[in-house]
Amino acid sequence: MITVIYPGTFDPITNGHLDIIQRTARLFPNVLVAVASNPNKKPLFDLATRVELVKQAVAHLPNVTVVGFLDLLADVVKERNITAIIRGVRSASDFDYELQLAHLNRLLTNGVESLFFPPSERWSYVSSTMIREIHLHHGDVSQLVPEVVFHALQNLKK
């Protein structure tokens, strides 16, 4: 059975991420969205909250499953017999970085390939970093994130 994985920190999940998940779900029978703990970053939301926000954002997609993970992505890929790794690439600088990761992941997973998805034009400028920055300065991100994330961000202000 073909299963692809879309890993990320998703802090928070954006409409750009959701767009890639929806497009991936149309192409593959099973999509695993893997939310990384990433201890090197100071997240806005803890891992459990990010997993829950992603689950709610993709609840309308029956072939998408969401998990959190603490290990190396390569370990998750091997444990779950993943067919391919999905990565979003917004720019040439993203591609350079993602290409290095793809080579490393191919080595660590005994050949699992990475597939690069460009964003839809509508979301090409959206990133979790931008969302956090706009939120920090009390800007309106309601058009850039799923509704559940917008409400979670509003609750952080209280």
UniProtKB/Swiss-Prot annotation:
Binding site residues for substrate: T9, K41, L73, R87
Which cofactors does this gene product need? Mg(2+)
Instruction: State its role.
Output: Reversibly transfers an adenylyl group from ATP to 4'-phosphopantetheine, yielding dephospho-CoA (dPCoA) and pyrophosphate.
Q: What name does this protein carry?
A: Phosphopantetheine adenylyltransferase
InterPro entries attached here?
Cyt_trans-like (IPR004821), PPAT (IPR001980), Rossmann-like_a/b/a_fold (IPR014729)
Assembly state and interactors? Homohexamer.
This entry's Gene Ontology molecular function terms read:
ATP binding; pantetheine-phosphate adenylyltransferase activity
Give the binding site residues for ATP.
T9, F10, H17, G88, V89, R90, E98, W123, S124, Y125, V126, S127, S128, T129
Write down the position(s) of the site called Transition state stabilizer: H17
Q: Which gene encodes it?
A: coaD
Query: Where in the cell?
Result: Cytoplasm
Domain of life, per lineage: Bacteria
Q: Which family does it belong to?
A: Belongs to the bacterial CoaD family.
**Cytoplasm: present as a keyword of the record?**
yes
Its annotated pathway reads: Cofactor biosynthesis; coenzyme A biosynthesis; CoA from (R)-pantothenate: step 4/5
Q: What top-level class of enzyme does the UniProt entry assign?
A: transferase
Q: Quote the EC number.
A: 2.7.7.3
Q: Please give a single GO biological process term from the UniProt record.
A: coenzyme A biosynthetic process
Identify the keywords attached in UniProt to this record, alphabetized.
Answer: ATP-binding, Coenzyme A biosynthesis, Cytoplasm, Magnesium, Nucleotide-binding, Nucleotidyltransferase, Transferase
